[in-house]
Regions:
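Active-site Tyr-X1-5-Lys
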Residues: 117-137
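NAD(P)H-binding glycine-rich loop region in Rossmannoid oxidoreductase-like domains
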Residues: 35-101, 113-115
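Conserved glycine-rich Rossmann-like NAD(P)H-binding loop of the short-chain dehydrogenase/reductase
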Residues: 25-32
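Rossmann-fold NAD(P)-dependent oxidoreductase module
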Residues: 15, 19, 97, 131
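SDR active-site strand-loop-helix element
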Residues: 6, 30, 73, 106-111
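A short helix->loop->beta-strand "cap" motif at the edges of active sites that frequently abuts
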Residues: 100-105, 136-137
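N-terminal Rossmann NAD(P)H-binding glycine-rich loop of SDR-like oxidoreductase domains
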Residues: 3-25
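Residues that mark the start of a beta-strand
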Residues: 1-2, 105
């Protein structure tokens, strides 16, 4: 399979990258800063790295259309007062571009939720989940 992996520079994404490659997949790693991403030489033949920003829809044309699945592991860890809005913009842009590819599966890592008592952080994760669920994958 050809799999798109966002969040490849994060802990979970970097661990998942190794698992996906070990299983024989070709992985397209999306990173905001290519200089911060240094995969081991042993897997470089199985990956493609593209630099883009899901807040900038003009960069998203770099995503290949022939992907089979996509992992959404992005998360805004910024202290910005509008991080919830930024996360929603990323999710909407992701949904739109992935819906235009051959991907049949989107895997999202959210959080454990108690919908009766959500922190601002978890409410944001829930909003991202709802946005991604609107996609046609």
């Amino acid at each position: 399979m050809k799999i798109l992996l966002t969040g490849a520079t994060g802990y979970i994404g970097f661990q998942l990258l190794h698992t996906l490659v070990s299983a024989g997949n070709r992985v397209v790693c999306c990173v905001r800063d290519i200089d911060r991403f240094s995969p081991p030489e042993s897997i470089k033949d199985s990956i493609e790295t593209i630099q883009l920003d899901f807040l900038d829809s003009d960069t998203l044309s770099r995503i290949p259309e022939d992907i089979d699945a996509a992992y959404y592991l992005m998360h805004s860890m910024s202290g910005s007062a509008n991080y919830q809005n930024l996360e929603l913009i990323c999710a909407e842009n992701f949904r739109k571009i992935i819906s235009a590819t051959a991907a049949e599966h989107v895997i999202y890592l959210g959080g454990i939720l108690n919908e009766n008592n959500l922190s601002a952080h978890l409410a944001s994760r829930k909003a991202v989940e709802s946005e991604l669920a609107k996609g046609t994958y």
